[in-house]
């Protein structure tokens, strides 16, 4: 029997890390690629090798925020018949074993297909701790936010380098758990370097909110994780690189490689002391 989501779990993780002067490492993978059983094993592997929070993407046929790597993973998962219901069943089975809170990344049409309240209720019952919907503007998110609040789920909103100050303020006020700072314009995917705008965006958010800020999109190497942490981010999110590893590694080697990659990223993001 699955447990209801624990309100504030994500915030408590960040508070504990802050007290230890650590930065959160947050990996992302796509559910169902290459299959749901591997997804389960990958989540457990990440959880046991340094992940502080976990992001799990529901595969969707038109993932506008995602680059080629995650789009391809979603296509493969859908071709295997992966459904949101099957993924949430998997989450319910796994969350009692996970140390790290789990955040579900989904496009809004998948929520609308079953209804906002019904989706959020089932997500909370699965034991997930948060929800991230990249294609839902905060201005249109009242119904989702209200339903999530009732169920004790965090709703994490994204801000972009191009977001004007008033929009930054609105999102900083509305988000719970943490603010997701998109490091660059465009879609997800590995980049060769961290965008110079990250430092400026972090400073703008610091002036508006005391909530943790995690940086994602385009971070794919330990060196980049180190750089983002050194700029003062509270969390480092790595997605496409994890998805690519699961897609390309030999089946008998993928979990071992994922564990090592996770440890490297966690260690790299702690190399410099963070703010007191």
From Swiss-Prot:
EC numbers on record: 4.2.1.20
Pathway assigned in UniProt: Amino-acid biosynthesis; L-tryptophan biosynthesis; L-tryptophan from chorismate: step 5/5
Catalytic activity: (1S,2R)-1-C-(indol-3-yl)glycerol 3-phosphate + L-serine = D-glyceraldehyde 3-phosphate + L-tryptophan + H2O
GO MF, one annotated term: tryptophan synthase activity
Domain of life of the native organism: Bacteria
Enzyme class: lyase
Keyword list, A-Z: Amino-acid biosynthesis, Aromatic amino acid biosynthesis, Lyase, Tryptophan biosynthesis
Subunit structure, as described in the record: Tetramer of two alpha and two beta chains.
Entry's family note: Belongs to the TrpA family.
Protein name: Tryptophan synthase alpha chain
Originating organism: Gloeobacter violaceus (strain ATCC 29082 / PCC 7421)
Gene that produces this protein: trpA
